[in-house]
């Protein structure tokens, strides 16, 4: 039996759900770029080089969009760009994304991950 996700009272198959999640991450990067262009600040404390890369390329290498509220547990948030935060991935000196999942990507997340304190809130 194929898995379906109830998203805002509409049922999506796994492929549709994956596309929805990816779309939210892409939109979050666009929003982040606009925010940095307008204010000079971002949703995280980007280095000057990272800001330049974001403005030039629309994203920052080594970072990925993380759904703060688990898309699997809270499917209504899967397509919400405001549910995305940018975390260092495993190719960096730290793996904030894995840390947000408490060491196992199968562990759901439920909130903002504070990399400094290494805690979800």
Each model region followed by its residue ranges:
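Nuclease and nuclease-like effector domains acting on nucleic acids or nucleotide cofactors
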Residues: 1-64, 69-121
């Amino acid at each position: 039996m194929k898995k379906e996700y109830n998203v805002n009272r509409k049922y999506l198959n796994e492929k549709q759900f994956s596309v929805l999640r990816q779309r939210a991450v892409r939109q979050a990067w666009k929003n982040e770029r606009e925010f940095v262009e307008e204010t000079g600040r971002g949703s995280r404390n980007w280095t000057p080089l990272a800001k330049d890369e974001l403005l030039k390329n629309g994203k920052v290498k080594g970072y990925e969009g993380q759904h703060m509220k688990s898309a699997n547990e809270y499917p209504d948030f899967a397509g919400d760009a405001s549910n995305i935060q940018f975390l260092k991935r495993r190719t960096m000196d730290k793996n904030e994304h894995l840390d947000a999942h408490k060491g196992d990507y199968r562990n759901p997340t439920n909130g903002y991950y504070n990399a400094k304190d290494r805690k979800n809130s």
